[in-house]
Amino acid sequence: MRLNLYHLLVLSFLSLITLFSCKGPSNSGELVGARLNKLKANKTPYGMVLIPGGTFIMGQSDEDITFSQTAQNRQVTIASFYMDDTEISNSEYRQFVNWVRDSILITNFLGDDSYFIESSSGERFIDWNKVGKNSPWRSNDENARERLSSMYYQGEDRIFGKNELDVRLLKYHYEWFDLRAATSARGDRTKSRSDFIIRDTMLIYPDTTVWLNDFSYAQNEPMVEGYFSHPSFDEYPVVGVTWRQAQAFNTWRTRLFNNAASSNKTMERLPYQLPSEAEWEYAARGGKVGMQFPWGGPTARNARGCLMANFKPGRGNYIDDGNAYTAPVYSYFPNDFGLYNMAGNVAEWTQSSYNESANSFVHDMNPTYTYNAKATDNEALKRKVIRGGSWKDIGFFLQNGARQYEYQDTAKSYIGFRSVTRYVGVSN
């Protein structure tokens, strides 16, 4: 018995040697490949759902009642991607605002080196673990409280001496590499990499005055004062955010995850960004063919007569769906992909620039049309596609194929956004 066990161990050892020798050592002179870190499986990002790739007919699914012909039908193919299951909420966007607020306080005002860590190259970075455990905003130290008071409104800007954050200080600097511009100039040897790095600095606090700007002679002051700052609205969609602010948010969100991945020695994620309008429409349809709405159709009510989304069902009637303004982001039933409020609640920014005939000339594989408009460009070049309709829109704009636009520097009380990120590999 002991001899048989010995023979078994010897055979097992020889089998392992044979197995590993078949793979070919790196110094064998054979082409064996240089593999990157092993990735067991794509993990769905928190708060997102996988949108499996497929093909669909993009454009109007019903009569073009305005006869605008801006959403011509076209069969296209979309690769797999991840998408937020809801619109970005006030609480999620506030995490971004608080990060910028704390960064500015620690870097420019606090003067406390204990909130920094130093890398091996000598660079200093904020220690976010310490910020989370010992936030300077909760400090009882008299010197620290005096320094952080610099971030409040000062002098005549104060009301009854109340400490209120001066949101004009909340600016976020971000950078990104313009791949399309670099590709177009790939044969130009006079260009360097820095020529294609776009740098921008944005005020990132939402414009709360949109509730008054968008509606004349309407008593919306309570929404100005509480919509973004009151905890009752935490799970409502953020509004008053421009297209450029949404871009800044996605850059920050990408860095937030990738910095954590670097610390944990795990795989980084491809950038978060706004969906193209083709991706948005494909996701909104939820795999249904030729349907008007994310839930199917042909009406905006279910068999019991209940409205399926938050919109304006009749003249002067905003509240038949149960909400006078926006609704919480998990309201109503999701579509077949698990996405909430792809019709109504708030219209959503997309990555795509608006062109009336875009459906006619974009590619039939992952179609998109983008243009990085500068401040000096013509206003028509600053138009960005918005999709889905909103709480103040009539039912026509809730259709999957309905297209609208808004200018990239414009904030509205009825426009929000959600993010996507790429699925790496093949999903089926």
Where on the chain are the PLM-derived regions?
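Bacterial N-terminal signal peptides that target proteins for export
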Residues: 2-9
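Hydrophobic helical h-region of N-terminal Sec-dependent signal peptides
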Residues: 10-14
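C-terminal motif of bacterial Sec signal peptides marking the signal peptidase cleavage site
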Residues: 19-21
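Functional-site microenvironments in short loops/helix caps that host divalent-cation chemistry
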Residues: 23-30, 50-51, 57, 62, ...
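N-terminal pre-domain segments of enzymes
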Residues: 25-41
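Short, P/G- and charge-enriched loop/turn segments at secondary-structure junctions
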Residues: 36-38, 70-71, 371-374, 403-408
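A short glycine-rich, aromatic-capped structural motif
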Residues: 41-230, 234-246, 344
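Short, structured beta-strand segments at or near domain termini in extracellular proteins/domains
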Residues: 413-428
